[in-house]
């Protein structure tokens, strides 16, 4: 696994899904063990930041022998998000910290997956001693990256216009959260999905999951 060549001081594990399984001989346990090896490569002063809502990550933590903190929506998370609300492309939530007052976060990004990612950033910044107001300001100014819910523009059509969104989501779980974000942005609009499979092996291994997900869409 190429990510074992990375040697960060802080490592965030957002989730562990069955992906790139050819690398792990089709063995999910081998994939999990590789993540554990990656975390054990952290220096003694390093930190693992773990999304506690993911059951695989939660189980992995019980075997981890490095300093770690957790984040998520669960009440026992060290850094917890609640009061999540989305209006259009913006998302607001409260980020609760182990010590001190919660931080009000206003993101220029839609979707609960971006809340999770922002909460991980809050946890890291807080551990590094960044002031809460600077954390909030920095996250509010972040507008995302290319091909991650990227608005390509509006196309005129017979009954008005169509918003075109490009997203690199290529795993069923990623596609699902992207579609959820789109529905939350435009709850009263039709959703038309154009999906391009990526990698033969991924499409083969996750074919049934892709079919189930995309078949649930009306168009």
Which residue ranges define each predicted feature?
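Short glycine-centered, acidic/aromatic-flanked micro-motifs in structured strand/loop junctions
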Residues: 107-109, 166, 195-197
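Acidic, Mg2+-coordinating active-site environments of NTP-dependent enzymes
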Residues: 4-163, 188-189, 215
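Conserved cofactor-binding/catalytic machinery of classical short-chain dehydrogenase/reductase
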Residues: 120, 170, 174
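Short, flexible loop segments at the rims of nucleotide/cofactor-binding pockets, characterized by
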Residues: 23-29, 169, 198-203
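Active-site beta-alpha connecting loops in nucleotide-dependent enzymes
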Residues: 145, 173-175, 179-219
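Switch II (G3) loop of P-loop NTPases
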Residues: 1, 163-170
């Amino acid at each position: 696994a190429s990510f074992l060549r990375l040697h960060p001081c802080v490592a965030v594990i957002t989730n562990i899904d069955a992906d790139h399984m050819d690398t792990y001989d089709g063995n999910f346990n081998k994939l999990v063990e590789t993540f554990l090896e990656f975390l054990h490569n952290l220096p003694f002063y390093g930190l693992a930041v773990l999304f506690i809502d993911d059951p695989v990550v939660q189980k992995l933590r019980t075997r981890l022998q490095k300093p770690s903190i957790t984040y998520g929506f669960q009440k026992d998370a060290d850094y917890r998000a609640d009061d999540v609300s989305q209006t259009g492309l913006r998302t607001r939530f409260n980020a609760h910290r182990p010590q001190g007052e919660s931080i009000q976060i206003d993101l220029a990004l839609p979707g609960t997956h971006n809340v999770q990612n922002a909460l991980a950033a809050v946890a890291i910044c807080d551990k590094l001693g960044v002031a809460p107001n600077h954390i909030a300001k920095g996250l509010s100014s972040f507008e995302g990256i290319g091909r991650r819910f990227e608005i390509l523009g509006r196309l005129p059509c017979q009954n008005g216009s169509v918003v075109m969104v490009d997203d690199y989501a290529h795993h069923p779980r990623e596609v699902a959260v992207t579609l959820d974000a789109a529905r939350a942005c435009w709850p009263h609009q039709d959703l038309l999905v154009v999906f391009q499979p990526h990698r033969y092996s991924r499409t083969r291994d996750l074919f049934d999951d892709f079919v189930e997900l995309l078949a649930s869409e009306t168009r």
